[in-house]
């Protein structure tokens, strides 16, 4: 865990800053958190459940799928957008990815922002274990997006939210007034050639309404663009895609394999997402006290990417 990242963290119990103390991080009131040998630190408060986070098998599938480059054009587009809207390097702040998964998208963004460090936050310990080695300037933390984030007020100059939960109040609290929030969300036809035949979760038709409800009290839309690409996925890639999302929980593996075999090999697939840029609204930030939100019923991360 880099010291340049630790400065942006906050104790999940008292909200105080953290400092290195041997192999642990410790706040001024004595709460201590061990840094795992893989380089990440868990800042999930005692008793917090990790339900909904990716399992180790799901993380391996996601890593395989993304490492093959299927969504490389999206990662590059997101990185270009981040570089275009980021404040001057003279303005302090980290790049925070809430629901970072393996750290794939955060690593791409840091590649375009050489003066910044990144903070990957995810409820899944297997995910942050992988994110900790996604880029040399990433620090990885296990944390819950629906609780108070273990991040200092105004710590982030950029916040990323890629196919992940959105806690508007907390995103506003941790984002600098000069910062920007980048949200990636699927369009109705995103990977439609797979979701239907494989019986996977489809895109919520009310996604724009839900996004507005979560963010409009705290952020204003500064811009949006659509990213589309034609993909060709062989059956191995399709299997990895299915295994990295909620299908891994509720779909019979034998039935899923049979459905994949009925697809063309390779199969033509449409990548269709919106990249939206939000700026913090002027005025008071969200209150500094514990910020929680009821966890929605669906899993925290979809198979969108």
Give residue spans per PLM region.
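Class I SAM-dependent methyltransferase Rossmann-like catalytic core
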Residues: 51-77
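Class I SAM-dependent methyltransferase SAM/SAH-binding core
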Residues: 94-97, 101-148
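Conserved class I S-adenosyl-L-methionine
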Residues: 180-212
